[in-house]
Every structure is written in structure tokens, then in C-alpha cells.
């Protein structure tokens, strides 16, 4: 999903934009932006467990095409309790602080259906963009999202379908499979700050 806000930046020239990596299970923003993530790098998860940290000190400036436009708060070390952290008062307070400094804040989250982490984030969003990929996303996800809309859990909803091949017929078919996997494991005995991605 991180590719969606990055694409939108093309239309936000001159605006102050923050991208928050709130997928605390399988963070990918660093890969998309070419940032070499280390397991002990502080980020969102660090700020949510340690109120003494200064949020602004852990926000990165993006160079290259989006220099001067995009700031990023990376996910930080993978915690054992992502849903709890994202639903905490600490996260609410952090957003209240950051929104004073930015015109737009994008929150990249884990897939709604597979984990509960993203559910608490919905209440903060003015717009929820749900990203699906042709020949990739399981069609069984649709009823779940539709129920959230029907139950008014989502206020404003946008659906993005990407990966469509021009002239191909495959996107009319629905034999999709969702391939979201977690390349890590929890190590409760090691305390906070662990991680398997040391690249």
C-alpha cells in the first residue's frame, strides 16, 4: 500500500507531507524508498513505548524526487504487540502532535483482513484507501471491507486496483491469492528492540 501515497505526492507539490509506517509486522516503506533498515533503528514503535523520545528527531527527510516534499516516520523495531500500540493513547497523542506540522499525513498499514492492527487506525483517517492488486489479492477480502463500510466503521472509502496489464484479460478473472507473509518471528524473551531484518 505504501506505493499509493508515494504516487499521490506527484500532485502535492509544495505541500508538507508525512508518511507513517504503521505496518509493524512486515514493514516495507524502507524498501520502496531505498532506505537500509536496521533492526534497532528507532521509529513509530519506539515512540509509542517511550514517551521520552522526541518524535521530530526520528522523522527522516526523503531525498531525490521527493526532496523537500516528503518526510517519513519509519516503523521502527518490530514489537510483540502491534495492535495494542496502534490503538493506544500514545498513538493518538503522536498524531495530534504531528498534524500541526503537516498538510497531509499518510498512514501505511498492514492488510485489514489478515491482522487486527489496522482496525484502530480507521478512526483517525479522513479517507481510507484500500489497495488491491490484480491477480494477487484474494477476492474473499471484499465482503469484509464492504461490511466495514456498511457498519460505518469507515467514513470515506477509496478503492485502488493496481497491477492491471494493458490489453490483458486476466484482470477480469477472480482466481486471486493473497500473498502477504511475515518474514520475522516474535522473540518474547529478548525484550523490545529485537528484529530479524538487519539489512
Give names to the regions the model predicted.
Residues 1-199:
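P-loop NTP-binding module
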Amino acid at each position: 500500500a505504501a506505493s499509493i501515497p508515494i504516487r499521490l505526492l506527484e500532485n502535492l507539490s509544495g505541500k508538507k507531507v508525512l508518511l507513517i509506517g504503521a505496518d509493524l509486522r512486515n514493514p516495507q516503506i524502507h524498501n520502496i524508498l531505498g532506505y537500509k533498515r536496521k533492526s534497532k533503528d528507532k521509529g513509530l514503535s519506539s515512540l509509542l513505548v517511550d514517551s521520552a523520545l522526541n518524535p521530530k528527531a526520528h522523522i527522516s527527510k526523503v531525498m531525490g524526487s521527493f526532496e523537500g516534499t516528503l518526510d517519513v516516520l519509519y516503523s521502527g523495531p518490530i514489537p510483540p504487540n502491534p495492535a495494542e500500540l496502534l490503538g493506544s493513547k500514545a498513538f493518538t497523542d503522536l498524531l495530534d502532535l504531528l498534524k500541526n506540522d503537516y498538510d497531509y499525513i499518510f498512514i501505511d498499514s498492514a492488510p485489514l483482513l489478515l491482522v487486527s492492527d489496522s482496525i484502530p487506525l480507521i478512526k483517525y483517517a479522513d479517507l481510507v484507501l484500500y489497495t488491491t492488486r490484480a491477480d494477487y489479492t484474494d477476492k474473499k477480502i471484499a465482503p469484509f471491507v464492504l461490511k466495514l463500510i456498511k457498519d460505518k466503521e469507515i467514513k470515506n472509502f477509496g478503492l485502488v486496483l493496481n497491477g492491471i496489464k494493458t490489453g490483458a484479460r486476466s484482470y477480469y478473472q477472480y482466481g486471486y491469492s493473497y500473498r502477504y507473509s511475515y518474514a520475522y518471528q516474535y522473540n518474547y524473551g529478548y525484550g523490545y528492540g529485537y528484529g530479524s531484518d538487519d539489512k
